[in-house]
């Protein structure tokens, strides 16, 4: 039997969101050249029964169970270790792709770009609103010839707003930080240091969906500490490569002041 050629590997970390995961997978076209790698981060057995999912019969879905846990960063690294596609895309299990995805994939299947950045919607289910992603600002500014590509590479840092040539990731051993939050930022920034042939598309390909209970909106001190340490790493790397835009630490601390023990404030400013 001839082995199918995989052009696109979709990597989706998952934990305890079976219905939303099903919705995400259904937004990805079923094609011979696509594989969807779902890495389950030790979901609760009373919440998830993977044997009952409609997509369990799809030939393009690969389920990897990580019983040791480790968070989304660990799950994405496992996905990278198992991906076979020429291109990689990342999705969160509670998000979806737009109807533009299929044509977008066809447009770049044989291109020689290292990376293609694309636009996203933000759908706010918390306040029943819908607005453009702030990350589109970097893309729109660049496409209007008022910005530079460095701001796109280092500003549009979410993993899900880009089509990535897998060989760039493998050859440079670019990995996700295996922490509970902010695990994706340094991956994208390190990736930006290595990509040379870059395309920026005005197509809206991804729906980022805000909902109650998502880690991005969990008011946790641990999330703050992870974010703070990531910003230190981020600024250190920016300094190393000569990129002038940095995260202003006092502003970050002010914005997150409710998470900080006032007696410990000095150690963040030293």
Report the location of each language-model feature.
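C-terminal subregions of glycosyltransferases and related glycan-biosynthesis enzymes
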Residues: 2, 30, 57, 180, ...
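Cell-envelope/extracellular polymer assembly enzymes that use nucleotide-activated donors
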Residues: 6-9, 27, 35, 186
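Short, well-formed alpha-helical segments that are part of the catalytic scaffolds
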Residues: 13-30
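Conserved short acidic donor-positioning loop in nucleotide-sugar-dependent glycosyltransferases
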Residues: 16, 28, 41-45, 70, ...
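Acidic donor-binding segment of Leloir-type glycosyltransferases
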Residues: 25-65
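Glycine-rich, basic loop-to-helix element that forms the pyrophosphate-binding segment
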Residues: 66-83
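Donor-binding/catalytic cores of nucleotide-activated saccharide
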Residues: 72-76, 93-198, 209-224, 228
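Short aromatic/hydrophobic "clamp" motif used to bind/position activated sugar donors
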Residues: 88
């Amino acid at each position: 039997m001839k082995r199918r050629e995989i052009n696109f590997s979709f990597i989706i970390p998952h934990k305890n969101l079976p219905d939303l995961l099903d919705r995400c997978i259904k937004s990805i076209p079923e094609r011979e050249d696509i594989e969807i790698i779902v890495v389950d981060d030790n979901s609760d057995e009373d919440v998830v029964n993977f044997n009952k999912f409609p997509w369990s019969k799809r030939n393009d879905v690969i389920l990897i169970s990580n019983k040791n846990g480790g968070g989304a960063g660990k799950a994405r690294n496992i996905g990278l270790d198992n991906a076979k596609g020429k291109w990689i895309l990342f999705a969160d299990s509670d998000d979806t792709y737009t109807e533009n995805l299929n044509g977008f994939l066809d447009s770049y299947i044989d291109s020689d770009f290292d990376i293609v950045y694309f636009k996203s919607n933000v759908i706010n289910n918390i306040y029943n609103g819908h607005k453009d992603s702030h990350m589109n600002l970097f893309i729109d500014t660049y496409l209007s010839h008022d910005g530079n590509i460095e701001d796109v590479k280092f500003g549009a840092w979410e993993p899900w707003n880009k089509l990535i040539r897998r060989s760039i990731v493998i050859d440079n051993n670019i990995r996700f930080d295996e922490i509970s939050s902010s695990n994706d930022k340094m991956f994208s920034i390190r990736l930006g240091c290595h990509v040379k042939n870059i395309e920026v598309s005005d197509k809206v390909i991804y729906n980022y969906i805000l909902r109650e209970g998502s880690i991005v909106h969990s008011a946790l001190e641990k999330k703050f500490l992870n974010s703070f340490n990531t910003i230190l790493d981020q600024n250190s790397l920016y300094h190393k490569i000569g990129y002038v835009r940095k995260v202003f630490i006092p502003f970050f601390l002010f914005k997150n002041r409710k998470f900080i023990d006032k007696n410990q404030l000095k150690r963040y400013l030293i």
